[in-house]
Amino acid sequence: MADLGVKAGDKVLLVWSQPSSPTTLKELAESLGAMVGTDGRVSLENMERLMMSSHAASSYDWVLSSVLSDSFSVHTSETLAEMARVIKPDGKLVLEEPVTGTDDQKVRTAEKLISALKLSGLVSVTEVSKEPLTPEAVSALKTYTGFQGNTLSRVRMSASKPNFEVGSSSQLKLSFGKKTSKPVDKPVLDPNAARAWTLSANDMDDDDVDLVDSDALLDADDFKKPDASSLKAPSCGDGTTKKKKACKNCSCGLAEESEQESKGAKTISQPKSACGSCYLGDAFRCASCPYIGMPAFKPGEKIVLANTGLNDA
């Protein structure tokens, strides 16, 4: 245990589990006591009674769990959380646990053990060593857990508690004052770059500069007024077997022609009076008069009849 880094004045919690030899446990406790000296302390705790103990939070510099060669234990998430609770900030946890090479409900893999340590709030989780279990330990583990696999090994993990307490708070210094920004220097304009984009009047009068005459761009045909038929697209209203249909955003006049045709088709010729006295009222109208039931109107006034009335007439 000398390679762990336990020094004088440290407080160590040694967690042991069955089966453990009392002699081996006593020798390890005495060895740790000699390391920490009179200013330190070594406490012993059984794994099964750890959750029922009343250890103060953040009271140990070290927690050593199942590090005896003749013992083993599968650490639950509750046990790992309790160990993380009693460790001081920046304290260390060293544990040993049997792992398997394949996923199993009884014994987990080394990767899952690392994940469980991180979920308990510990950091800097590293795998220190890994060695095969002795036949006696394998037999005892199968009896204890019911595991029936053969890919078993013993792994030692090291982890640290963060240098702050869980749930601790710290005041943040925030400044909401308006910050004065330094004046930004205006970039200096390159005279060569400005000269490249400048065209002077002298350059316009230069004989080497070819200017295009705008009047020469049009010929005599461009000034002729186009015929309406020439403006129509080849496919505009095309087809003799189908009705002419104007294109979208038509500009050739076909849309106006179609609109006039549709208005003319909707015009209904109103029946004309034969007696000339229909406008006076029902008293002066014939029995088959289409204006029966309508009020009197002025001569020449436009009257629109319903389709039902025309059908009945």
Curated annotation (Swiss-Prot):
HAMAP family: Anamorsin. PANTHER family: ANAMORSIN. This is Anamorsin. Belongs to the anamorsin family. InterPro entries: Anamorsin (IPR007785), Anamorsin_N_metazoan (IPR049011), CIAPIN1 (IPR046408), SAM-dependent_MTases_sf (IPR029063). GO terms for biological process: apoptotic process; hemopoiesis; iron-sulfur cluster assembly; negative regulation of apoptotic process. Residues 171-223 are annotated as: Linker. Pfam families: Anamorsin_N, CIAPIN1. Its main location: cytoplasm. A motif (Cx2C motif 1) lies at residues 275-278. The keyword Nucleus applies. The gene is ciapin1. Residues 6-170 are annotated as: N-terminal SAM-like domain. It comes from Oncorhynchus mykiss.
